[in-house]
Amino acid sequence: MATEYWSRHLRSVLAPLFAAAGTYSPEDQESHLAFIDEHIAPNLGPLPWEPHGPYSTPSSLVGSPFDPSINIVSSGKAKVRFDFDVISPPDRTGPDPFAEGSAREILHRLADLVGADTQWMGYLMDALYLTPAEAEVAKTKLPPGVAIPPSSVGFDFDGPERTLKFYIPSVRKALATGQDVSELMLKTLRGLQPLGSELVPAMDLIASYLSTRTNDAMLPLVGIDCLDPRTHKNARVKCYLHTSSNSFAVVRDVLTLGGRLSDDTSLKRVETLKSVWPLLINELEGPQSDAATMDESWSKPERLNRTGYSGIQYTIEITPGQAIPDTKIYVPLFQYTDSSEVAERNFESALKKLGNEWGLSGKYRSVMQEIFKDVENYGQTYASFSYTEGKGVYTTSYVAMPIKDEGGGSLAGDFGFRN
């Protein structure tokens, strides 16, 4: 029954996204949806009104454990993606209180299905999952309201291909062992194999920045592409940074690693983002509405403070042999308006300003209105932004179908990394 429920929930968003993207043949769409029915729906846990560990994805804002998204490059080409958290037990009891054993089983099974490489994933699991003794310590130190998934699972869909992505936090291990969250993650990443030595120059930049930054940026999470880096030189290690402040001065500082990234691409990335910043934070009137003259030191008050999704998230994306990393920002649109319609309109205006076909033609809002036509206020959760010389500007829209059975849903309250 739960699998059938989750299959309907997943299809309600993903089927129209695949159709709208314009990059998937009918055969691709049918294959991907069948894969989702058979291998993703069974892993979303019990029915939402039955006992389960807290949902901690941004989609928990509307009661869902599942984060669908659509990535749109400057040419208008689009790719569908999604991620979900491995669901923990409701009461942290039993032999697998934090679902780390379950996460190992789920991820290795999915890796086998799609032919993914597990070398980096296996190393990170061994380094950051808890020993039995550490699990006992974590149970006493972690307050019940803290939601830290053991891992998150993601998939990118490129034509007929499916690429597995794996995400793992260092927060629980740091708490259980008394280590600093960022230092533990950096130490762990320095031992990554294979090709860990080729990641060191970019890792050194991140470590240097975190040791001298004037804001509170920290590194609680890492994500990887489950590809063999020896044959896929574009395999990424994505270092997720978080800041409490949402001022553009802090954004600029993080995206350039305190000025360490001063190449033309990094600087253009920041200035292009600045041109649409007022739209992303819903500042359409007043002094902060003009990107050219706005006060970069100003932080906008948030709707929902003290949540796991307050402030701003970033990724510093490193690949073997590349000394200069790419940087990306994730803006929580829901923090700046309680209306999905307003967030949707602002995001399309940003696409239009960036010259993206999905904005210029009105396609973005048309697709959203078709998917969520029966929903009064859906989850417009995040927008990500980056720029590279090869891709140009590329953005991702993260959306979520509400689960009404959850009574409206509530955003995950605390991930523990600021405690």
From Swiss-Prot:
Residues annotated for L-tryptophan binding in this entry: 58-59
Keyword Transferase: yes
Enzyme class: transferase
Keywords attached to this entry: Transferase
Disruption phenotype: Impairs the production of terrequinone A.
Pfam families according to UniProt: Trp_DMAT
Described purpose of this protein according to its UniProt entry: Indole prenyltransferase; part of the gene cluster that mediates the biosynthesis of terrequinone A, an antitumor agent. The first step in the biosynthetic pathway for terrequinone A is formation of indole pyruvic acid (IPA) from L-tryptophan by the aminotransferase tdiD. The nonribosomal peptide synthase tdiA then immediately converts unstable IPA to didemethylasterriquinone D (DDAQ D), via condensation of 2 IPA molecules. The symmetric connectivity of the 2 IPA molecules is thought to arise by head-to-tail dual Claisen condensations facilitated by the TE domain.
Source organism of the structure: Emericella nidulans (strain FGSC A4 / ATCC 38163 / CBS 112.46 / NRRL 194 / M139)
Inducing stimuli: Specifically expressed at both asexual stages. Expression is positively regulated by the secondary metabolism regulator laeA. Expression is also positively regulated by mpkB. Expression is also positively regulated by mtfA.
Family: Belongs to the tryptophan dimethylallyltransferase family.
GO molecular function: prenyltransferase activity
Pathway: Secondary metabolite biosynthesis
GO BP annotations listed: secondary metabolite biosynthetic process; sterigmatocystin biosynthetic process; terrequinone A biosynthetic process
InterPro entries in UniProt: Aro_prenylTrfase, Aro_prenylTrfase_DMATS
Enzyme Commission number(s) of this protein: 2.5.1.-
Superkingdom of source: Eukaryota
NCBIfam families: arom_pren_DMATS
Binding site residues for substrate: 81, 165, 167, 236, 238, 240, 330, 394
Name of the protein this chain belongs to: Indole prenyltransferase tdiB
Catalysed reactions listed for this entry: didemethylasterriquinone D + dimethylallyl diphosphate = asterriquinone C1 + diphosphate
